[in-house]
Amino acid sequence: MAKIITNLIRTAAIGLALAATSSHAQAQGYPERPIALLIPYTAGGPTDISSRVAADVASRVLGKRLVVENRPGAGGALAASNMAQNARPDGYTLAVTPITVLRLPHISTVAFNPITDLTWIINLAGYQFGVVVRADSPWKTWQEFTAYAKANPGKVTYASPGYGTTLHITMERIGERDGIKWTQVPFKGTADSVVALRGGHVMALTGSVPSEQIEAGIFRTLVTWGERRPVRHANAPTLKELGYGIVTNSPYGVTGPKGMDPAIVKILHDAFKGALDDPAFLKTLDRLGHDPFYMSGDDYFRWARENYEIERRTVERMGLKQ
């Protein structure tokens, strides 16, 4: 009997050793071909632009090209959802992942769980959100804008990435506080929202404050949503300054399918982390109105797990479940 147990232990040990050797060999040869990076918004938007620059940096480190594929939809959750359901955990399909993936399962029925079905690799940046209008609009301040909206229920239209996104929820929170009813007009990304605002199809835009349009005198920033005023928009107050008690920070990073080899995860983490030291990437973030926001894979996963519950409570409190 003792001999049988000894043999079983030996066999198990050999199996573990072979598995470790196979994993090591796989990681040593990785990557052997181009890697697909799914972007959750339309081409030409802020997340698309910053992600492409990060992908270029990672490509140089890895020695293989990251091929960007735009998968807009579901308020930014479609890319990660498609990856989680269809991709093999071999490191050749990744997704840029916004906070929407943590909220969507609480709003509607989805076919994946972002906590158990994703590998959280690295967080890279966070959005500087705010509300902007055209420079020729009649509203010079946030107070003027909200006064008009309150006096004209449902008349003010604003562009957002869709129902249940951080932008939609924050505008609803503001509306609850101020007794305002406004009309959300959903688009697949900021690029489309910018076009709509420039064309006069909506009255305001919520999202990453487009610095270039502000500096060119095309748009005017009425309010920002961060902890402090962005350097490029120092003339616009924050919601916090105005007494709302609302601070919105929405990180985004890179995830993969569940079950990825930890050695490959580290290779990818280190490749993308190089972007946070790259002048071109940092300059791009500044131009787009984003902040560098690093979280390691472990920290990113812990953050996701905590915020998954926070989002559940928010959806329940605001009655957003469909």
List where the protein language model places each region.
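Short secondary-structure boundary segments
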Residues: 98-99, 135, 208-210, 226, ...
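N-terminal (or domain-start) structured segment
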Residues: 26-117, 155, 163, 178-208, ...
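An extracytoplasmic/periplasmic, membrane-proximal ligand-sensing/linker region
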Residues: 32-34, 176-180, 262-322
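N-terminal secretory signal peptides that target proteins for export/translocation
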Residues: 1-7
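Bacterial N-terminal signal peptides
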Residues: 9-21
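Stable alpha-helical elements in mature extracytoplasmic
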Residues: 46, 50, 54, 58, ...
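Anionic-ligand binding region
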Residues: 192-247
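Hinge/capping helix and adjacent helix->loop/strand transition within the periplasmic-binding protein
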Residues: 85-92, 105-192, 239-244, 249-284
